[in-house]
Amino acid sequence: GSPVYFAAPNGALCALLDRVFYAASTHGGLFKGKPAAAVASCMRSGANSTIDRINKYFSFSEMPIVSSNYWNMLFDTQSQMGTDEKGNKTMQTLGYNMVAILQK
């Protein structure tokens, strides 16, 4: 997951994902078949483009992408942490769906 800055994941996360997924792809697809879910936390907007960018790493690595009942995003500021009821419900559903995939 990522906080959203300027409608994109932060640079440190992108650099990490670039290195990790490049290394995995050159060593026989280490992440192939492993389920994954992207999550974004933002104040107002930019979460969709952030989730899209993170999901591309999963797609290119042949990883099943686990979804929820809505976009995997939370709308909170640091001082309001945990107050986004719809976002919290979305995360709970995402957790249930991830468990269901992992138990198969």
Residue spans for each PLM region:
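Helix-loop-strand module that forms the ligand-binding subsite of alpha/beta enzymes
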Residues: 1-64
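Glycine-rich phosphate/pyrophosphate-binding loop and the adjoining helix
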Residues: 59-104
